[in-house]
Regions:
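Charged helix-capping and loop-helix junction motifs
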Residues: 95-103, 135-142
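A short helix->loop->beta-strand "cap" motif at the edges of active sites that frequently abuts
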Residues: 43, 111-115, 155
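Serine-esterase "nucleophile elbow" of acetyl-processing enzymes
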Residues: 1-53, 65-75
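Conserved catalytic region of serine esterases and O-acyltransferases that act on ester linkages
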Residues: 152, 175-178, 182-258
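Oxyanion-hole/transition-state-stabilizing segment in secreted/luminal serine hydrolases
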Residues: 16-20, 58-99, 123-124
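Residue-level recognition of beta-strand->loop/alpha-helix junctions
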Residues: 49-51, 120-121, 159-162
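Conserved, well-ordered alpha-helix/loop/beta-strand core segments that scaffold catalytic motifs
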Residues: 80-82, 109-110, 116-117
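Substrate-gating cap/lid alpha-helix
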Residues: 126-160, 181
Length: 258
């Protein structure tokens, strides 16, 4: 296997680790889990997580890529880039702007010689409905863009849609958007397998069916989701603010994990 001496991650809440367990007030996340495992396999391993929740692809390009470029060490660096999902979720999303931005960012990062790691997004989060169809339409186009540019530059692409279980409620946080601790663990193991590192071979073993929710329980969950996530999300959109405003990256410089 290729032994990476450095892992740099760029992006939004997915890579920051929102929804995972918190340690000292910070979410752990799949990226930190991967970094800890890689550190056990490589002396003097360092990790740099620049991801911040709520960031749009243009913000990741402007704020995070210049910082990451300072620390890339060619093929010995594993470089994760996942941005654009927040753009896709916005009412005014314009794929003619966002998708080319994404491609150019990937080309710039690939030119450093680092091993790129890209991600697709879950395309189906519900069985049916107008919102599901809009979600599927937008994210399937976004994902095709990720796959195409990933193939062009020789990136490793972690395709969420090859793991249908990841969209089940057992792996999603109560906001239905972020992963829970089990979900972050699952993504970490899938990434470790993709990059040729030691991984848990049982991470994608068949799972028993989830118990059916009763009608009252389903209504309670729906009301809780609307009041704790949907209404605040709409409020932020109306006020033009982001969940990432005023936040800083977990690691402003590489940290040694071994």
């Amino acid at each position: 296997m290729i032994r990476y001496s450095r892992f740099i991650t760029l992006g939004d809440s997915f890579t920051e680790g929102v929804g995972d367990i918190q340690i000292d007030g910070q979410f752990m996340g799949w990226a930190d889990r991967v970094a800890e495992r890689l550190a056990k396999q490589q002396p003097d391993f360092s990790f740099y997580n620049l991801a911040i929740r709520g960031k749009l692809v243009s913000q990741v390009i402007e704020d995070q890529i210049p910082e990451a470029m300072k620390w890339i060490e060619g093929p010995a660096t594993l470089l994760s880039f996942h941005a654009g999902a927040n753009d896709v979720l916005r009412p005014g999303y314009d794929p003619e702007v966002v998708l080319p931005q994404y491609r150019e960012a990937v080309r710039k990062l690939a030119a450093t010689g680092a091993q790129l790691l890209l991600f697709t997004a879950i395309e189906r989060v519900a069985k049916s409905g107008k919102m599901q169809e809009l979600w599927h339409q937008r994210f399937s186009t976004f994902n095709n863009n990720v796959r195409a540019i990933g193939l062009e530059v020789g990136a490793i692409v972690a395709d969420a849609n090859l793991d249908p279980d990841i969209a089940s409620r057992r792996f999603l946080d109560t906001d239905r958007l972020h992963l829970n601790p089990a979900g972050h663990t699952r993504v970490a193991e899938s990434v470790l397998e993709l990059i040729g590192a030691d991984f848990d071979p049982n991470w994608n073993a068949p799972l028993p069916p989830l118990p059916e929710l009763g009608k009252i329980q389903s209504i309670q969950i729906e009301v809780q989701w609307i009041t704790t996530f949907l209404i605040p999300w709409i409020s932020r959109r109306i006020r033009g603010i982001s969940s990432g405003d005023g936040r800083f990256a977990k690691h402003s410089a590489p940290i040694r994990l071994s």
